[in-house]
From Swiss-Prot:
Protein topology in the membrane: Peripheral membrane protein
Family: Belongs to the WD repeat PROPPIN family.
Cell compartment(s), UniProt: Preautophagosomal structure membrane; Vacuole membrane; Endosome membrane
GO cellular component: endosome membrane; phagophore assembly site membrane; vacuolar membrane
Biased composition (Low complexity): 285-296
Protein name: Autophagy-related protein 18
InterPro entries according to UniProt: PROPPIN (IPR048720), WD40/YVTN_repeat-like_dom_sf (IPR015943), WD40_repeat_dom_sf (IPR036322), WD40_rpt (IPR001680)
Functional description taken from the UniProt entry: The PI(3,5)P2 regulatory complex regulates both the synthesis and turnover of phosphatidylinositol 3,5-bisphosphate (PtdIns(3,5)P2). Necessary for proper vacuole morphology. Plays an important role in osmotically-induced vacuole fragmentation. Required for cytoplasm to vacuole transport (Cvt) vesicle formation, pexophagy and starvation-induced autophagy. Involved in correct ATG9 trafficking to the pre-autophagosomal structure. Might also be involved in premeiotic DNA replication.
């Protein structure tokens, strides 16, 4: 049996694992198996909070909505191309294909909107768990230039969009079904997006993976800038804690980084700027903060709808800058230096269970009840680490389980330090 997919639910109280022989659902605190089916080769699955509703992909284009309590299929949908990702909250079901996003009303399962996107083979997309701030974030579609000649009428349709060449994010209100803003997050294409539980913060990473940025939603003000590392690395997972005071990031390295957000300044002009905006001096940002001079210059609006809603998010808004500008030291009034991690975790050495297929992939989340980081790896290991919220530093491994253990006594591998 192999593990195909793993995900936490929206409040991190459950963990769902898709395998070549069905899927399993575990509670995270305390850890234990709560549901299992041994039918189907499950490519993707997604839970709806702590309900019995689960969306699963049994074949590349076929989605089933299941009720695990009644062990019944609520509905089944078939899509024109392979389903790459599922996102759920209490209002919307979002299906991500390579060049389309389908939005459904989760109460009626009716299709309410279709979005044409740039090619998105990695399904880069985030949906806020919040019903009040039902925002969807995905790479800004980039239209293909008009062809230099008219294609033959009998030929295949030409592509309307091209792969993104920069890291801009479109924020879309999935409830009102309208675009609300564009975040100019990175110079290079995106690799991962994450929204916090309230739908008020967006974390972004580019394909370089060295710099993590956090923006307010929907205003698109840049609030935080963090350095993951100096060497490029693929970002596998990013997750805010429930209170949005910490951001956890995993990548193709063995280190998981935890960044401290502190007070959410910049969300309103009346906020008192008590958080530390400057960071310890380090080496240059992502391509020297992705070429600070060009980032800090205003971009011309193009007169289109996107141009009307576009805001230069790398350039902090005038009112926000006026509020916090006096608190920045002279050296960083023009450019924020990225802050280092507050705490970090080293994953235990691999036992080769990954089959030598490359780095061990990991999905991270933070416990709602305790100062703990939960990590699931592509080898089927579930780790729990304690972190010191006052001092930070390296986290301590306190528990370890296997999500692929055939035994029902899933707690038998518990480590107590």
């Amino acid at each position: 049996m192999s593990m195909n997919f793993v995900t936490f639910n929206q409040d991190y109280s459950y963990l769902a694992v898709g395998t070549s022989k069905g899927f399993r659902i575990f509670t995270t605190d305390p850890f234990g198996k709560s549901y299992e089916t041994k039918e189907g080769n499950i490519a993707i699955l997604e839970m709806l909070f702590s309900t019995s509703l689960v969306a699963v992909i049994l074949s590349p284009r076929r989605l089933q909505i299941m009720n695990t309590k009644r062990q019944s299929v609520i509905c089944e949908l078939t899509f024109p191309t392979t389903v790459l990702a599922i996102r759920l909250n209490r209002k919307r079901l979002v299906i991500v294909l390579e060049d389309q996003i389908y939005i459904y009303d989760i109460q009626t399962m009716k299709l309410v909107y279709t979005i044409e996107t740039s090619p998105n083979p990695n399904a880069i997309c985030a949906l806020a768990p919040s019903s009040d701030n039902c925002y969807l974030a995905y790479p800004l579609p980039q239209k293909a230039p008009p062809p230099s000649f008219s294609p033959p009428s009998h030929g295949p349709p030409s592509n309307t969009h091209i792969p993104p060449t920069s890291g801009e994010v479109l924020i879309f209100d999935a409830y009102k079904l309208e675009a609300v803003n564009v975040v100019e997050a990175h110079k290079s294409p995106l690799s991962f997006l994450a929204l916090n539980s309230e739908g008020t913060l967006l974390a972004t990473a580019s394909d370089k993976g060295t710099i993590i940025r956090v923006f307010s939603v929907p205003a698109a003000h840049k609030l935080y800038q963090f350095r993951r590392g100096s060497m490029p690395s693929r970002i596998y997972s990013m997750s805010f804690n429930i209170t949005s005071t910490l951001l956890c990031v995993s990548s193709a390295t063995e280190t998981i980084h935890i960044f401290k957000l502190g007070q959410q300044q910049g969300l309103s002009k009346t906020s008192s700027p008590s958080r530390k905006l400057e960071s310890s001096r380090g080496s240059g940002d992502e391509s020297a903060v992705e070429s600070a001079s060009s980032e800090m210059s205003s971009r011309k609006h193009n007169g289109t709808f996107m141009g009307m809603i576009r805001r230069t998010s790398q350039n902090v808004g005038n009112s926000f800058a006026a509020t916090v500008g006096g608190y920045l030291p002279k050296g960083v009034t023009e450019m924020w230096e990225p802050e280092r991690d507050f705490a970090w975790i080293k994953l235990p050495k691999s036992n080769g269970g990954n089959g030598g297929s490359g780095p061990v992939r990991s999905v991270v989340a933070m416990s709602s009840n305790t100062p703990q980081v939960m990590v699931v790896t592509s080898e089927g290991n579930f780790y729990v680490f304690n972190i010191d919220l006052s001092k930070g530093g390296e986290g301590t491994l306190v528990k370890q389980y296997s999500v692929l253990d055939s035994s029902d006594r899933m707690g038998s591998t518990d480590l107590d330090y």
